[in-house]
Amino acid sequence: MARLGFGLVSCTFFLAASGLYSSSDDVIELTPSNFNREVIQSNSLWLVEFYAPWCGHCQRLTPEWKKAATALKDVVKVGAVDADKHQSLGGQYGVQGFPTIKIFGANKNKPEDYQGGRTGEAIVDAALSALRQLVKDRLSGRSGGYSSGKQGRGDSSSKKDVIELTDDTFDKNVLDSDDVWMVEFYAPWCGHCKNLEPEWATAATEVKEQTKGKVKLAAVDATVNQVLANRYGIRGFPTIKIFQKGEAPVDYDGGRTRSDIVSRALDLFSDNAPPPELLEIINEDVAKKMCEEHQLCVVAVLPHILDTGAARNSYLEILLKLADKYKKKMWGWLWTEAGAQSELENALGIGGFGYPAMARINARKMKFALLKGSFSEQGINEFLRELSFGRASTAPVGGGSFPAITAREPWDGRDGELPVEDDIDLSDVELDDLEKDEL
């Protein structure tokens, strides 16, 4: 059973944006500033709820969550993250709906989704079951407890995506590259560097995956590579610098947690990435590439060219503008003409609201959400924003699989032309005959 999904949440009213828990509760409030210290670097088993204060399901869970936290006190840690306020932390763990509950066991980098009931008793049972399994794993030697990757600089498996640079390799890799580089200058004996290492290593893997290698994380042993250390004025450890082609390096002054580093890297990627492609659905390859190779894809169905003429370009301009605005999300963007992909429209229930129409598809889960507001920059922006926060309702794609796509020629960019009617030759028609017919 999957965790509470994007489409199973129906939080339909808002409350003041205040947390559901207080310091007097046994539930530990978690934020980006303390999450790594409290959870990731802990040997304890953690149950963490990602919630939004306005969510009705979260409000109903609150007393049960508090009850479980009290029962499990000093046995299992029970925490909560306001994911509406701390979106970077929710995004880091793929939170798309509220509440989402995750169990952080031996491997804190791979939490498990909680699949049980929402009562205090069910939560306690699940926690004790997970704790029992953790102890068994430790007894059998399969787990050493805390495993966030703190194996030291010599263990390449813990930092496989961190690129080690030297005086000899730095210029070719960094200065001659079109990619963005975040480079840590460290000293092996430095305690702060050792604390940063697992965060840097884990962030490197996430950044590589999310930016397709366009932002790279690297490390330089400044005690050995003193040419580089002197060139960039390294006086303390760790020092992190950001290198972008054609620009002077700048110091990274953000937080030292994985989420902080990933967030900054994605901002750099967004600033430097070109706008996403907006492709017309002309065959199955185009549709599946944009939907199956991206976490989500946005599909617009525009009116027939004979119904809009030059207005089609206005619609496309709106889509391009919003694709650029949301490029950090790395969604796929598609459009088609009304009636051109009838099976796709049927599978998404498009057409009932008229055209233009829009749907957002999660091809992995075969779920979609429809735009029910205005097809305008403001209306679409609000739709996409609600989706980002997990507030929009979704439904299964009709048929349970990606619909068949009809191959067609791409739009040539010109206005449509009405079919020309054949001229009728009236030379053989006798007017006298017409007058008789009228009589």
UniProtKB/Swiss-Prot annotation:
Q: Which GO terms describe its molecular function?
A: protein disulfide isomerase activity; protein-disulfide reductase activity
One Pfam family, short name: Thioredoxin
> EC number(s) per UniProt?
5.3.4.1
Q: Which GO terms describe its biological process?
A: platelet activation; platelet aggregation; response to endoplasmic reticulum stress
The residue numbers the entry assigns to motif Prevents secretion from ER are: 436-439
Q: Where is this site: Lowers pKa of C-terminal Cys of second active site?
A: R256
Give the top-level enzyme category: isomerase
Give the record's GO CC terms: endoplasmic reticulum lumen; melanosome; plasma membrane
Ubl conjugation among the record's keywords?
no
Q: Where is the Thioredoxin domain?
A: 20-133, 151-287
What Gene3D superfamilies would the database entry show? Glutaredoxin (3.40.30.10)
Q: What residues correspond to the site Lowers pKa of C-terminal Cys of first active site?
A: R118
**Tissues in which the protein is found:** Expressed most abundantly in lung and kidney, followed by heart, liver and brain.
- Site description Contributes to redox potential value, residues in chain: G56, H57, G191, H192
Keyword line: Cell membrane, Chaperone, Disulfide bond, Endoplasmic reticulum, Isomerase, Membrane, Phosphoprotein, Redox-active center, Repeat, Signal
Q: Which reaction does it catalyse?
A: Catalyzes the rearrangement of -S-S- bonds in proteins
Spell out which residues are annotated as carrying Phosphoserine.
S129, S156, S158, S427
Q: What does this protein do?
A: May function as a chaperone that inhibits aggregation of misfolded proteins. Negatively regulates the unfolded protein response (UPR) through binding to UPR sensors such as ERN1, which in turn inactivates ERN1 signaling. May also regulate the UPR via the EIF2AK3 UPR sensor. Plays a role in platelet aggregation and activation by agonists such as convulxin, collagen and thrombin.
Quaternary structure and interacting proteins, as annotated? Part of a large chaperone multiprotein complex comprising DNAJB11, HSP90B1, HSPA5, HYOU, PDIA2, PDIA4, PDIA6, PPIB, SDF2L1, UGGT1 and very small amounts of ERP29, but not, or at very low levels, CALR nor CANX. Interacts with MICA on the surface of tumor cells, leading to MICA disulfide bond reduction which is required for its release from tumor cells. Interacts with ITGB3 following platelet stimulation. Interacts with ERN1; the interaction is direct. Interacts with EIF2AK3.
What family does this chain come from, according to its entry? Belongs to the protein disulfide isomerase family.
NCBIfam families, sorted: pdi_dom (TIGR01126)
Q: What is this protein called?
A: Protein disulfide-isomerase A6
Species name for this entry?
Answer: Mesocricetus auratus (Golden hamster)
This protein's encoding gene: PDIA6
